[in-house]
Amino acid sequence: PVSVKTRLGYETPEEFAALLDIYNRYPIACLTIHPRVRKEKYRGPVHLDAFAAALEASRNPVCYNGDLRTVGEVCALEARFPSVTHVMIGRGLVADPALARKLRGGAGTNRKELSDFLAALYQGYTDFYQGQVPTAAQRMREVWFYLIHLFDDAEKLNKQLRRFRTPAEYERIQAEILAACPLRSDAQGDLI
């Protein structure tokens, strides 16, 4: 089976009709649609009306991908598009590593779980980059771009995260966030 991930087009959502004509010629196991065009990258609102039209016209099963960060957002999507049985979540899982568990009715995250997750991820990056700790720390900066929203009162430390120069600085800032910044109550539940 072949799956395809696509956007609505390069310049405008109207380009998708021609793309869908091509996709509909083949037995695709799952057509994952990110309802933005390429030039929008990840900015601006998703084009849900264009997604609705694509969903109706597709001959293949459709998976939704784009801006799903909370249980509430996934539930709203399911309510609006009940025929969508699959979703793809990317940055939403980086922003809330417990999101998949919460979608299955489980608990949100806690400070220890986040600390363990971040330590394992940092070590994984260090191993992957063959001991290049500065490179691993830079990768962690990218993770924190999304993850910082789980914490209250973290604005000052978030600025430091964006500007650190050494792995030791990164490690100090992360430790301070985990020790001093309150975990948002909705991080422990849902980010609605």
Residue ranges, per PLM feature:
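Alpha/beta catalytic cores of nucleotide-metabolism and tRNA/nucleoside-modifying enzymes
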Residues: 16-30, 42, 49, 53-64, ...
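Active-site glycine- and acidic-residue-rich loops that bind
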Residues: 1-18, 68-70
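A cross-family glycoside hydrolase active-site/sugar-binding cleft signature
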Residues: 3-7, 32-34, 63-65
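Short, small-residue-enriched loops and turns at beta-alpha junctions
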Residues: 8-12, 37-44
